[in-house]
Amino acid sequence: KSLGSCAMDGNRFPKLKYRIYQKALWVPYSQQPGVALQSHWNYSGIQNIDAWSNCPYVELFINKKSYGIVEPDQRTRQCTWRDIQWEPGTVEAVGLDTNKHPVCSEKIESSDKPYAIEVTIEKPAAKPTGEEFILKANASDAFIVTAKVVDKDGHWCPWADNLLKFEVEGEGIYKGSYNFYVTEGKDLSYHAPGDTELQAEGGLMRVAVRTTFKPGKIKVKVSSDGLISGESIIKSKKIKH
């Protein structure tokens, strides 16, 4: 989805490459130590676990049990622990300095079956001064809404592909999303612009909502059969003349 070389997909969801860059792994660890784990921990059976770090060493823990210390490849900064038996819980990669003392870490957790939908209105872009833009009732300002499928404990379900139904109430106009779901046995899944029913991709989906000329409350609700619905509210402001 999107160009393979891109750090983000068409819905602006970060790929693993984005997180690796975000950790500033190209600078010396003495300036900014960082470690990035693989995207999730939900495949069963025997598997390899990958992490990337600018530290001299990285130690892997699964449910607080150590699986050894690895030196990252000098060129790619990748380190791999092979033939690890999957078990539910928490995976942690800890970056170590030359004396093998911890200097940074990252955790990922396995998740249970899909249970609910979390709905988040993304923060608007900021001005050069750091001040956030105000959502104006000018019929052109828009905002991004993220729907995330989670388990009963609130953990993201990265394999979820539930059909999500979006509803907008109040002074907002639904503008749709980028959706090009690809899965085994279903190579392509197109949708018409403005479709309110979209299939989650990796347990996630994003849509755009535009303001009207009337200021007021905008509610976005997302539902799916068998899941607890979620919603979020934002207010558009009157234009000052």
Give the ranges of each region predicted by the language model:
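Extended substrate-binding grooves/exosites of carbohydrate-active enzymes
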Residues: 1-73, 79-102
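Beta-strand-rich structural segments
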Residues: 51-52, 94-95, 129-132, 137-158, ...
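Short flexible loop/turn segments that cap and initiate beta-strands
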Residues: 54-56, 60-67, 105-107, 142, ...
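Short, hydrophobic beta-strand segments
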Residues: 80-86, 192-213
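Extracellular Ig-like/FN3 beta-sandwich strand-entry sites
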Residues: 86-90, 142, 215-217
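Edge beta-strands of extracellular beta-sandwich domains
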Residues: 100-112, 228-238
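Low-complexity, Pro/Ser/Thr- and charge-rich linker/hinge segments at domain boundaries
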Residues: 106-135, 239-241
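Ser/Thr/Pro-rich, low-complexity mucin-like regions
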Residues: 216-231
